[in-house]
Amino acid sequence: LMEVFPTHHILSEESGDHGCSNSEFQWIIDPLDGTTNYLHHHPQYAISIALLHQGQLKQAVIFAPEKNELYVASRGEGAFVNERRLRVSKRNVLSECLVGTGFPVVNQKITPIYLSILQDMMRATAGVRREGAASLDLCQVARGRFDGYFEFNLKPWDIAAVSYTHLRAHETR
């Protein structure tokens, strides 16, 4: 990207900040979301890319190579997976909702809080699922397969592309 857009700013999980920090354009990239899954040959991993212009999300792409799923969201166009429009769930009663989650990095302060919330969610919802790649779990919310998602300490590269995808999917609800 730096060769094609030398005046843009890039924030990447793996390589940090690059380019012009005051650029109108910023790319937020997670080149491998679900690293542990990838290393264990589990298909739940993805590449996630978001483009911001003047601080506003404009384009998002999430690709799950093993599943051959390409999620694309564009302002004014909506959100799609492999050219099929995404629509979020209409469920709004918590006891009927299927919720996704991710486990935070083990931390003596956060782990007990997370486990308490997880226990409450397991009691209050139709079920909780953990698949190991935040971007793809959140894509399940955009698809209407999950009704919500919670996780602690997510970073911009974990959620930038998928949050935009979710917003565009919500527009077509």
Which residues are covered by each model-predicted region?
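Acidic, divalent-metal-coordinating active-site segment for phosphoryl/phosphodiester hydrolysis
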Residues: 160-163
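Flexible, acidic active-site loops/lids enriched in D/E/S/T/G that coordinate Mg2+ and/or position polar
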Residues: 1-54, 61
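Conserved small/polar residues in nucleotide/adenosyl-binding loops
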Residues: 165-172
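Acidic donor-binding loop at a coil-to-helix junction in glycosyltransferase catalytic cores
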Residues: 157
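Residue-level signal for inorganic ion chemistry
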Residues: 1, 35, 64, 73, ...
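Alpha-to-beta junction loops
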Residues: 143-148
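Acidic beta-strand-loop-alpha-helix segment within the catalytic core
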Residues: 49-138
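Short secondary-structure boundary segments
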Residues: 14, 103, 152-154
